[in-house]
């Protein structure tokens, strides 16, 4: 009996000690709105880092806050549990077609840090990097991208954020009642939160780099030109997209918002009544209404997205992006060798090539997003035929011409807008702008992920692939491959040196030539090859990455627009 009691006593003492020790080891941080308790994670090579997940940076955008600019976060009592991610914002699950996921209460961010201030005897603050997720402004969430490669050997504080998506994030009545761009204003609120609170995690608010891919890249570029974002960051990394890409600025958003109001049984003649009525409708019904503007296979990319604000007290986009002056900070811009490959791959699934071939005139204006730009049906069809002749000649759309389809999408959707953004920023700024083309194709590929049968190493890197070698993307298997590990190290070095100094890869600075400040000069960029070499290149904009094709295509559109 005594032995049994002794064993039980020791067991209770062990449990008590375990619970006490666990509680004492819980990382805690005090921010302006309250205390936060986080957890631990491990980087790619096993470094222990702190993680604080699901931190609210604004009040929930629900009920009367729906369709409002982000409201200040309210202080909480007790300790906020930051060991689990906050909900994604309501959006469409990528690849599902029509499934709505997430919650309306979604304005959360995640912070990762290798050390807290009390562990830093020198008191040095760390560089901060903020990642803005992509997803066409209608899907995605911050937690999908982790710093598990980036923080292996670098002392950075990493932040990822959620922001409102689709109709809930980008609806507009075209006036001061609902000016639009609330999703981007959410991002501004997150950047302001970082300025106020990041020191508590060991981060330096005066050394913030923002980065994003695709719609995240468009977001970063928009912050670079928005007066609302000035002074909130110090460097920018823009991957595979820009505010100059056609899909980055949504068209006819006010008319689309009225359409949704009518669809959900709301008035359509008065902006106040539209907004008040839509606030009473189920959030998921509003989110799902987005699909009415994607008539074929989730095209066009962004029916609801950034829009020029014609009214409002403080405008995020007071004019079209091309007319706004960028903030004078270092910028690193990149593009993948075959941006359009992932999209042509999706289009080829489930008999898509035949559907596109048989309905080219109807589908192409949505794929390339000029259905609203050219309102005249005959001119839209003529444009479709001109583009088909230019890219395909007399060949049908098929597996054999998949590369032609990829090139067409690359030129229109990414090549033209991204190169013009680099030239525009360089011409306006004194700070350097660097541009590179990512040409490495390994196992970390979106084509390999979604259609492994069509993929082979060394083929072509596509939209978003390079991000997989800097950030750990949720759902991707970590391959134990020597070449891919080497590329991870290479890409992390490019980012890390730029984050620290504003210059990428400082050991090879002679290869990284800034984009010329004179748009008439040769376009300077660095090519990262399949062999993982770096090549400094200077070419005419008409030649680089088929930009000549892009200009030809753009001229077709410009001509058609002038005729309408």
Curated annotation (Swiss-Prot):
The record, for CDD domains, names:
Esterase_lipase
Similarity annotation: Belongs to the type-B carboxylesterase/lipase family.
Presence of keyword Disulfide bond: yes
Gene3D superfamilies the record matches: alpha/beta hydrolase
Q: Does the keyword Disulfide bond apply?
A: yes
What is the protein's given name? Esterase FE4
Question: From what organism does this protein derive?
Answer: Myzus persicae (Green peach aphid)
Cited function: Overproduction of nonspecific esterases is a common mechanism of resistance to organophosphate insecticides.
From the UniProt annotation, give the residues forming the signal peptide. 1-23
User: Catalytic residues per the record?
Assistant: 214, 339, 463
């Amino acid at each position: 009996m005594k032995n049994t009691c002794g064993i039980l006593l020791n067991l209770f003492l062990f449990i008590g000690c375990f619970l006490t020790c666990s509680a004492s080891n819980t990382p805690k941080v005090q921010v302006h709105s309250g205390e936060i308790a986080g957890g631990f994670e491990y980087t790619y090579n096993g470094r222990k880092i702190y993680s604080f997940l699901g931190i609210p940076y604004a009040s929930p955008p629900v009920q009367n806050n729906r369709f409002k600019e982000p409201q200040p976060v309210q202080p909480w009592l007790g300790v906020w549990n930051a060991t689990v991610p906050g909900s994604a914002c309501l959006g469409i699950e990528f690849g599902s077609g029509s499934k709505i996921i997430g919650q309306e209460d979604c304005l959360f961010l995640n912070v990762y840090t290798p050390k807290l201030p009390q562990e830093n005897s020198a008191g040095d603050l760390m560089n901060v990097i903020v990642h803005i997720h992509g997803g066409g402004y209608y899907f995605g969430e911050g937690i999908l991208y982790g710093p598990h490669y980036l923080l292996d050997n670098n002392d950075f504080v990493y932040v990822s954020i959620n922001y409102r998506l689709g109709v809930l994030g980008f609806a507009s009545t075209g006036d001061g009642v609902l000016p639009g761009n609330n999703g981007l204003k959410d991002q501004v609120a997150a950047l302001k939160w970082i300025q106020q609170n990041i020191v508590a995690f060991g981060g330096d608010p005066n050394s913030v780099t923002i980065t994003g891919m695709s719609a995240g890249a468009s977001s970063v570029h928009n912050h670079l030109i928005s007066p609302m974002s000035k002074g909130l960051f110090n460097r920018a990394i823009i991957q595979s997209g820009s505010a100059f890409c056609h899909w980055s600025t949504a068209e006819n958003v006010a008319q689309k918002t009225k359409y949704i109001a009518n669809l959900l049984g709301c008035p359509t003649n008065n902006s106040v009544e539209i907004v008040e009525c839509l606030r009473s409708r189920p959030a998921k019904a509003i989110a799902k209404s987005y699909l009415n503007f994607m008539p074929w296979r989730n095209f066009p990319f962004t029916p609801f997205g950034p829009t020029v604000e014609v009214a409002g007290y403080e405008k995020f986009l007071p004019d079209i992006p091309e007319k706004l002056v960028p903030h004078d900070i270092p910028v690193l811009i990149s593009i993948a060798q075959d941006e359009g490959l992932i999209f042509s791959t999706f289009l080829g699934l489930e008999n898509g090539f035949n559907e596109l071939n048989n309905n080219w005139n109807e589908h192409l204006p949505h794929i390339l997003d000029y259905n609203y730009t050219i309102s005249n049906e005959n001119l839209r069809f003529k444009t479709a035929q001109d583009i088909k002749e230019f890219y395909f000649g007399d060949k049908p759309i098929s597996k054999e011409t998949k590369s032609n389809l990829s090139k067409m999408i690359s030129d229109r959707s990414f090549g033209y807008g991204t190169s013009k953004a680099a030239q525009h920023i360089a011409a306006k700024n004194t700070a350097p702008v660097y541009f590179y083309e990512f040409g490495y194709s390994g196992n970390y590929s979106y084509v390999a992920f979604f259609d492994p049968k069509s993929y082979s190493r060394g083929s072509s890197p596509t939209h978003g692939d390079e991000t997989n070698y800097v950030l750990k993307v949720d759902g991707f298997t970590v391959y134990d491959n020597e070449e891919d590990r080497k590329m991870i190290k290479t890409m992390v070095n490019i980012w890390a040196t730029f984050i620290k100094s504003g210059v990428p890869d400082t050991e090879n600075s002679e290869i990284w030539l800034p984009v010329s400040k004179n748009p008439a000069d040769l376009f300077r960029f660095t090519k990262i090859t399949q062999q993982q070499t770096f090549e400094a290149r200077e070419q005419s904009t008409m030649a680089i990455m088929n930009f000549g094709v892009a200009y030809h295509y753009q001229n077709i559109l410009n001509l058609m627009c002038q005729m309408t």
